[in-house]
């Protein structure tokens, strides 16, 4: 999977590769560099050690996370296990989210996109959500 240049920068800590894992909030993969990892680690470590919430995050995030290096052309190879977890087929789309990005099955993303755009419009128009 070719990762666009804007996601392979020193600014987000992804100049040499990305960390990829099943997204905690959506049925897709999430990926990013050291900056994204630091944000997740800080959120996990802010919770009391051994708490059910922290353990759930640790099990979901750390256990499923894979560091992936780029080849000479800026591509990564997604592990089959991650693809299965996210229900990815042959046709995927990369959705940029600032310092991170998501990898969606194209059909699932297309079904979600219109609802997300409508919500974004409500937020921008100051409507109660």
Predicted ranges, named:
Residues 1-3, 31, 74-78, 82, ...:
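Short, structured motif recognition centered on aromatic/hydrophobic residues
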Residues 2-46:
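Acidic (E/D-rich), amphipathic helical modules within compact regulatory domains
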Residues 9, 84, 111:
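Active-site micro-motifs of SAM-dependent methyltransferase domains
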Residues 12-29, 87-104, 121:
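A short beta-strand-loop micro-motif that forms or neighbors metal/cofactor-
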Residues 14, 43, 89, 115-116:
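Residue-level signal for well-ordered alpha-helical positions
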Residues 43-58, 65:
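Intrinsic, low-complexity N-terminal interaction/targeting segments
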Residues 66-89:
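Beta-rich strand-turn-strand
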Residues 107-129:
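Short, Lys/Arg-rich amphipathic alpha-helical interaction segments
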């Amino acid at each position: 999977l070719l990762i666009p240049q804007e996601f392979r920068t020193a600014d987000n800590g992804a100049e040499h590769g990305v960390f990829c894992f099943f997204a905690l909030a959506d049925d897709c993969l999430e990926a990013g560099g050291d900056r994204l990892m630091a944000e997740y680690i800080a959120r996990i470590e802010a919770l009391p050690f051994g708490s059910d919430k922290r353990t759930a995050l640790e099990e979901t995030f750390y256990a499923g996370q894979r560091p992936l290096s780029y080849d000479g052309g800026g591509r990564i190879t997604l592990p089959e296990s991650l693809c299965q977890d996210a229900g990815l087929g042959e046709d995927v789309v990369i959705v940029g989210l600032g310092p991170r990005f998501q990898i969606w099955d194209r059909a699932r993303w297309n079904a979600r996109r219109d609802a997300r755009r409508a919500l974004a419009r409500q937020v921008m128009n100051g409507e109660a959500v």
